[in-house]
Amino acid sequence: MAKFLKAGKVAVVVRGRYAGKKVVIVKPHDEGSKSHPFGHALVAGIERYPLKVTKKHGAKKVAKRTKIKPFIKVVNYNHLLPTRYTLDVEAFKSVVSTETFEQPSQREEAKKVVKKAFEERHQAGKNQWFFSKLRF
């Protein structure tokens, strides 16, 4: 079978706490690992999406409404619904790894890097679909 869950592929989580949230695959593990003996992927996603901004909003309100709250997680392939979209993950690929999940402080640092990368892409107006809430 062809490997289509590659790094950079956007997917939707269908089970658990982050169900309905969009994620981007950072590192796929098709064969599994010792700690997770099943096909899984390291993903970075958006827990809280940015809100709509209009012309009448001031600078302070715009800054507050464009904030993004990210998450990083190991997700089973069975719980991912892949989409046709892709996203560049080079900005945070080196920071999010299996070692990131060992220490809470490392996890927080990785989240900060992911947040910065996501906010830069959102401000630039790229990948607009990824930054909009999934309506269902």
Curated annotation (Swiss-Prot):
SUPFAM superfamilies reported for this sequence: Translation proteins SH3-like domain (SSF50104)
Keyword entries, A-Z: Cytoplasm, Ribonucleoprotein, Ribosomal protein
Signal peptide: none
Gene Ontology biological-process entries: cytoplasmic translation
GO molecular function, one term: structural constituent of ribosome
Superkingdom of the organism of origin: Eukaryota
Alphabetical list of InterPro entries matching this protein: Ribosomal_eL27 (IPR001141), Ribosomal_eL27_CS (IPR018262), Ribosomal_eL27_KOW (IPR041991), Ribosomal_eL27_sf (IPR038655), Translation_prot_SH3-like_sf (IPR008991)
Main location: cytoplasm
Presence of the UniProt keyword Ribosomal protein in the record: yes
A cellular component term, taken from the record's GO annotations: cytosolic large ribosomal subunit
Subcellular location: Cytoplasm
Other facts: Present with 7380 molecules/cell in log phase SD medium.
Described function: Component of the ribosome, a large ribonucleoprotein complex responsible for the synthesis of proteins in the cell. The small ribosomal subunit (SSU) binds messenger RNAs (mRNAs) and translates the encoded message by selecting cognate aminoacyl-transfer RNA (tRNA) molecules. The large subunit (LSU) contains the ribosomal catalytic site termed the peptidyl transferase center (PTC), which catalyzes the formation of peptide bonds, thereby polymerizing the amino acids delivered by tRNAs into a polypeptide chain.
Quaternary structure (record): Component of the large ribosomal subunit (LSU). Mature yeast ribosomes consist of a small (40S) and a large (60S) subunit. The 40S small subunit contains 1 molecule of ribosomal RNA (18S rRNA) and 33 different proteins (encoded by 57 genes). The large 60S subunit contains 3 rRNA molecules (25S, 5.8S and 5S rRNA) and 46 different proteins (encoded by 81 genes).
Record family assignment: Belongs to the eukaryotic ribosomal protein eL27 family.
Protein name: Large ribosomal subunit protein eL27A
Protein species of origin: Saccharomyces cerevisiae (strain ATCC 204508 / S288c)
